[in-house]
Curated annotation (Swiss-Prot):
Potential calcium sensor. Residues 30-45 have a biased composition (Pro residues). Keywords: Calcium, Metal-binding, Repeat. This is Probable calcium-binding protein CML49. InterPro entries: CML48/49/50, EF-hand-dom_pair, EF_Hand_1_Ca_BS, EF_hand_dom. Induction: By touch and during darkness conditions. Residues 110-141 have a biased composition (Gly residues). GO terms for molecular function: calcium ion binding. Ca(2+) 1 binds at D177, D179, S181, E188. Residues 1-154 are annotated as: Disordered. Ca(2+) 2 binds at D243, D245, S247, R249, E254. It comes from Arabidopsis thaliana.
């Protein structure tokens, strides 16, 4: 051992023991990187377990004009109180940042605080988000509205008649397809059905085309035309079976039984609405004629099938977001 005190720059053989460990969370003499959390990995995107301000991915958007965190059809168990402060720079009564349908903002992330999404001034959404019309724009990686990924309607593709199709159906289609394109449009379909004593309004024809093609292109091919033709024959036989007095109309009770035979059980309230809607007399007869019976069946069938796509457990309940709800209902309103 030398007579000199041990060096403070090292821990040579026989020297003093190393100094105590640095404080929790530090990395020696270097400061921890911004945003680090020690040895624990960062929570996954959208996790709400460790971040009280995080909005789960897929959460319901805030209603137009409401405070950013007002619950629009809140998910079960979501009892958070609405955020009472207005967004930075927003005028009284202005819509929430990002517009209707954007991810709601909440807490310090509105102002770009620690852990918040980077904000942009002026118009435009954040990186990866859909363009915004007002406010600060969407957050980093915010999902754009569903419609931006493409139309929900199916593409209309060429088809052929199924093997063994009735030659009369083939001849009917070919007579309507004057340009030999392999498709017939709404006017041509209306004329083709009239030739078989099936006269329908253009609205009913549009509903038929939508239900059998799942497309908003008002054309139909041989395969879909064949399915449509046989379905109409089936519905006509059902109408005649339940028109027991041969009046050419079916009343509320007969409509209930007819829909039940098609597999649709609707309540008396809905039955009254259907009869009021499709009664040509404006509700005086409280009965539906054949052509409107077809439109009524198309509406009930179409809405039920769209609902069952969401009700995968067949529980009688389903969850729709705003976009899906509008896309489900509007085709039956604007046909």
């Amino acid at each position: 051992m030398s007579g000199y005190p041990p060096s403070s720059q090292g821990y040579g053989y026989g020297g003093n023991p190393p100094p105590p460990q640095p404080p929790y969370g530090s990395t020696g003499n270097n400061p921890p990187p911004y945003g680090s959390s020690g040895s624990n990995p960062p929570p996954p995107y959208g996790s709400s377990a460790s971040s009280p301000y995080a909005v789960p991915y897929g959460a319901q958007p805030a209603p137009y004009g409401a405070p950013p965190s007002a619950p629009y059809a809140s998910l079960p168990g979501d009892h958070n109180k609405p955020h009472k402060e207005k967004p930075h720079g927003a005028s009284y009564g202005s819509p929430s940042p990002g517009g209707y349908g954007a991810h709601p903002s909440s807490g310090p992330s509105d102002y770009g605080g620690y852990g918040g999404a980077p904000q942009q001034s002026g118009h435009g959404g954040g990186y990866g988000g859909a363009p915004q019309q007002s406010g600060h724009g969407g957050g980093y990686g915010a999902p754009p509205p569903q419609a931006s990924y493409g139309s929900p309607f199916a593409s209309l593709v060429p088809s052929a008649f199924p093997p063994g199709t009735d030659p009369n159906i083939v001849a009917c289609f070919q007579a309507a397809d004057r340009d030999n394109s392999g498709f017939i449009d709404d006017k041509e379909l209306q004329g083709a059905l009239s030739s078989y004593n099936q006269s329908f309004s253009i609205r009913t024809v549009h509903l038929l085309m939508y239900l059998f093609t799942n497309s908003n292109v008002r054309k139909i091919g041989p395969k879909e035309f064949t399915s449509l033709f046989f379905s109409l024959q089936n519905w006509r036989s059902i109408f005649e079976r339940f028109d027991k007095d041969r009046s050419g109309r079916i009343d509320t009770n007969e409509l209930r039984d007819a829909l039940m035979s098609l597999g649709f059980s609707v309540s008396p309230v809905i039955l009254d609405l259907l009869v009021s809607k499709f009664d040509k007399s404006g509700g005086r007869n409280r009965a539906i004629e054949y052509d409107n019976f077809i439109e009524c069946c198309l509406t009930v069938k179409g809405l039920t099938e769209k609902f069952k796509e969401k009700d995968t457990a067949l529980s009688g309940s389903a969850i729709f977001n705003y976009e899906n709800f509008m896309l489900t209902v509007l085709p039956f309103l604007v046909a």
